[in-house]
């Protein structure tokens, strides 16, 4: 487990973080530019030091201001992948990778090369690689050092969209196949949706919220950080049925019998596969009685848990309980008043099957 309790002054920003992160999975650090995300990563890695506090990784003290312990970066056993790959230009790809594992080619070396699909790059120099290829090599070098923690600081930020699409499948494979805990710094919700198990919301140098990704994503505290089209809930479940006649897939939510029909994702259409889906609040409507004839494929029983009014934008955010899962619906103030919505009322949430697109789905 990574335990952080530090303070560091960064110009006008005070980085004041108290946080515990699990020793497995991917923990995403999310926040706006200038929130202190990269500064926090640098403090953990030892590239910079806080004024006061304590950092431990798996019960190993990395920094303690009281006992004057400040372990240098090379002793912390932390891998770091930066926004720019920072490969050694005078080494070929193989040399860069071997640097990560002490110069010896081991079975682990071959596994990582295969995982990242970089065998064809081994004899090339960094200057001849695309941005996406450089990042894959940088990730491989960091993994080969067998770190106790891998920090990835916006690894896709410097890439154009095609290169991001090139690298993302490899990051998804890493999330599933390597056992190293990863701290993933990003301001991209799409990246976090596809990769993270846990999420930390950092605001002006302090932690506003942390926990498993579905609870943080569905929290009202996330809404100010998102524009109207991004207001959404994350749901996790298992593919339980494939429609026999149409390209539609039923996802049964975790710890529930409730199912949601979505367009079949092209990369994970098999029963029993775990999947995560994003339901946008603008795609959810409410109806009091279940209709008998409707083109909408998902009409789900819900209970209103909260209503949050935004008069400036004429929107009411309705927090719904869907079989123990959080769902959000954005409606107008007019609809709220006419329907006389109130906390504790039972309604039906309507979600069109086509509203959940490929970008809203990922396998887990």
UniProtKB/Swiss-Prot annotation:
ATP binds at residues 31-38. SUPFAM superfamilies: MOP-like, P-loop containing nucleoside triphosphate hydrolases. It is a peripheral membrane protein. Transmembrane segments: none annotated. It is an enzyme of class 7 (translocase). It catalyses: molybdate(out) + ATP + H2O = molybdate(in) + ADP + phosphate + H(+). Residues 293-360 form the Mop domain. It is found in: Cell inner membrane. Keywords: ATP-binding, Cell inner membrane, Cell membrane, Membrane, Molybdenum, Nucleotide-binding, Translocase, Transport. GO terms for molecular function: ABC-type molybdate transporter activity; ATP binding; ATP hydrolysis activity. Pfam families: ABC_tran, TOBE. The keyword Transcription does not apply. Its EC number is 7.3.2.5. It comes from the Bacteria. Part of the ABC transporter complex ModABC involved in molybdenum import. Responsible for energy coupling to the transport system. The complex is composed of two ATP-binding proteins (ModC), two transmembrane proteins (ModB) and a solute-binding protein (ModA). Belongs to the ABC transporter superfamily. Molybdate importer (TC 3.A.1.8) family. This is Molybdenum import ATP-binding protein ModC. It comes from Aliivibrio fischeri (strain ATCC 700601 / ES114). The lineage of its organism: Bacteria, Pseudomonadati, Pseudomonadota, Gammaproteobacteria, Vibrionales.
